[in-house]
Amino acid sequence: MMLNLIIVHLFGLMTPGPDFFYVSRMAASNSRRNTVCGILGITLGIAFWGMLSMLGLAVLFVTIPALHGVIMLLGGSYLAYLGFLMARSKKYAKFESHSDTEFNQQTTIKKEILKGLLVNLSNAKVVVYFSSVMSLVLVNITEMWQIILAFAVIVVETFCYFYVISLIFSRNIAKRLYSQYSRYIDNMAGIVFLFFGCVLVYNGINEIIH
């Protein structure tokens, strides 16, 4: 049962989306501390959705259909806003000595964790994933120890996956490539965020209306 959970969740994580683009961009352009904080935020978001799924997220959406639409509308709006800011970026990243220290001084751990959390919570793809695919996996988990273990598996696997992604994109070759093409990478990532956001807003409005 837990093996099925690990496999299903791994494939869910491997599907490219806002979380992946956020972590890879942070790893290539920001400090290690800030990137890990972002990963912690995303992991907290996954933990939140995982807990809701175990408490009957799918049943809640069936009982209150408009709730799903509201979540998609709010999440889509935030993603679209992030996408707009990134899509209009005209600056190239510059990596200098002590850049990690400078990055760390420009923000706080709390702010970076919150950024990662908001990126995940605003991603309605995660909502659909946990309310449909993951619910089918978790439906047979009824014992308290199984619930605790399943929750731990989801949280640990999420953090480990994105930490590995951050290690890959924080390598010097990745930083050089990002520095050289950062404007275009940010613009493309922004377009992806904007697309996700607009689709979610559109679908959210449709669900609320109907």
Curated annotation (Swiss-Prot):
One of its GO terms (molecular function) is amino acid transmembrane transporter activity. Keywords: Cell membrane, Membrane, Transmembrane, Transmembrane helix. It is a multi-pass membrane protein. The chain crosses the membrane at residues 42-62, 66-86, 126-146, 147-167, 189-209. InterPro entries: Homoserine/Threonine_efflux, LeuE-type. GO terms for cellular component: plasma membrane. It holds the Pfam family LysE. Disulfide bonds: none annotated. It comes from the Bacteria. GO terms for biological process: amino acid transport. It is found in: Cell membrane. NCBIfam families: 2A76. Belongs to the Rht family. This is Uncharacterized membrane protein HI_1307. It comes from Haemophilus influenzae (strain ATCC 51907 / DSM 11121 / KW20 / Rd).
